[in-house]
């Protein structure tokens, strides 16, 4: 599970979910990638589920890159608690993903298997996604 080792502040404000991604919008490491089309909070468990879905489908011979990291805590108050008495305790770690962000990248020799692996991973994520391929002119 991806969580930060230590943080300066245990609790943070909720991040905003508006606007487009400022960086990380193109495939940089692999040949194929999953790009977000809608904004969402992605938890550390969802990132891990997507990674497992990809790696199990490609078995061996491919490489996976994860370009997002859950560095924001989300808090929750216990059930049946009255209002007030402070902010709840941290429950999840999330990555705030904006539209256009390439979250996962994959390098695999067979395009059909690579696309199927990315499709399986996209089903584990809480937003609409599309599969993008590295352009010929990109680094």
Curated annotation (Swiss-Prot):
InterPro entries: Ribosomal_uL16, Ribosomal_uL16_bact-type, Ribosomal_uL16_CS, Ribosomal_uL16_dom, Ribosomal_uL16_sf. One of its GO terms (molecular function) is rRNA binding. Residues 1-20 have a biased composition (Basic residues). It comes from the Bacteria. Gene3D superfamilies: Ribosomal protein L10e/L16 (3.90.1170.10). Transmembrane segments: none annotated. The keyword Plastid does not apply. One of its GO terms (biological process) is translation. It holds the Pfam family Ribosomal_L16. Keywords: Ribonucleoprotein, Ribosomal protein, RNA-binding, rRNA-binding, tRNA-binding. GO terms for cellular component: cytosolic large ribosomal subunit. Residues 1-22 are annotated as: Disordered. Belongs to the universal ribosomal protein uL16 family. HAMAP family: Ribosomal_uL16. Binds 23S rRNA and is also seen to make contacts with the A and possibly P site tRNAs. Part of the 50S ribosomal subunit. This is Large ribosomal subunit protein uL16. The lineage of its organism: Bacteria, Bacillati, Actinomycetota, Actinomycetes, Kitasatosporales. The gene is rplP.
